[in-house]
């Protein structure tokens, strides 16, 4: 599995701001979107382009445009919505697929409860977004769902990842690509990432 920990100074700075315990909902939400945008920049660096001729101000001009790759952004509800706008800044014409999965706090197992995928998803590259890759259960379940629907090109974008979640994802889906702003220390006994960000969903939606 291709694993990319994005080490750009802006990413590290913004993620560091997000780790503040008393950060406001507004600021956390803004930063989640901004880091999501920067991760998208990295994750789409290998998209192919083709030369086309357009009408410029001084006549015909040859430019490069992305070659035919259709994209669907897949936020995992609910926290993934906090990164979605940042992703769409770079791929505004992407279609949105939505997957709802929550983690049972006792068993730590993923529980699917909603899905709405775009049509012809087998023709699209999926950018799956979720702030945290902890145990990996929710992400694995989401990718299972996408593959069962025919999607084969899948990239995962997360703000922070635990080594345990990375290992689980790699074992289940070695063909996906992972882009993260940080590979953190690991999980505590409750399955939370340390040092992590706390409950990203609560911080994004103001329910903490």
UniProtKB/Swiss-Prot annotation:
InterPro entries: PRibTrfase_dom (IPR000836), PRTase-like (IPR029057), Upp_B (IPR034332), UPRTase/APRTase (IPR050054), Ura_phspho_trans (IPR005765)
Disulfide bonds: none
Co-factor(s): Mg(2+)
UniProt activity-regulation remark: Allosterically activated by GTP.
Enzyme class: transferase
Cofactor note: Binds 1 Mg(2+) ion per subunit. The magnesium is bound as Mg-PRPP.
Pathway: Pyrimidine metabolism; UMP biosynthesis via salvage pathway; UMP from uracil: step 1/1
Residue numbers binding 5-phospho-alpha-D-ribose 1-diphosphate: 78, 103, 130-138, 199
GO BP term, pick one: uracil salvage
Catalytic activity: UMP + diphosphate = 5-phospho-alpha-D-ribose 1-diphosphate + uracil
Key words of the record: Allosteric enzyme, Glycosyltransferase, GTP-binding, Magnesium, Nucleotide-binding, Transferase
Residues annotated for uracil binding in this entry: 193, 198-200
EC annotation from Swiss-Prot or TrEMBL: 2.4.2.9
GO MF assignments: GTP binding; magnesium ion binding; uracil phosphoribosyltransferase activity
Domain of life: Bacteria
General function of this protein: Catalyzes the conversion of uracil and 5-phospho-alpha-D-ribose 1-diphosphate (PRPP) to UMP and diphosphate.
Family (UniProt): Belongs to the UPRTase family.
Name of the protein: Uracil phosphoribosyltransferase
Organism: Edwardsiella ictaluri (strain 93-146)
UniProt lineage: Bacteria, Pseudomonadati, Pseudomonadota, Gammaproteobacteria, Enterobacterales
């Amino acid at each position: 599995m291709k694993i990319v920990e994005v080490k750009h100074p802006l990413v590290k700075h913004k993620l560091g701001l997000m780790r503040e315990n008393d950060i406001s909902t507004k600021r956390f939400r803004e930063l989640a979107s901004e880091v999501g945008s920067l991760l998208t920049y990295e994750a789409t660096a290998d998209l192919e382009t083709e030369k086309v001729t357009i009408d410029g101000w001084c006549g015909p001009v040859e430019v490069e445009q992305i070659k035919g790759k259709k994209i669907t952004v897949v936020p995992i509800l609910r926290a993934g919505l906090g990164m979605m706008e940042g992703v769409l800044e770079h791929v505004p014409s992407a279609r949105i697929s939505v997957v709802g999965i929550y983690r049972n706090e006792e068993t730590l197992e993923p529980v699917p409860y909603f899905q709405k995928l775009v049509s012809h998803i087998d023709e699209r590259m999926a950018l799956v977004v979720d702030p945290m890759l902890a145990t990996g259960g929710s992400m694995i379940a989401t990718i299972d769902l996408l593959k069962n629907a025919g999607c084969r090109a899948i990239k995962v974008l997360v703000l922070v990842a635990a080594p345990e979640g990375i290992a689980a994802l790699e074992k289940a889906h070695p063909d996906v690509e992972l882009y993260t702003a940080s590979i953190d220390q690991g999980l505590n006994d409750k399955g939370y990432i340390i040092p992590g960000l706390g409950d990203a969903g609560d911080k994004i939606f103001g329910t903490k």
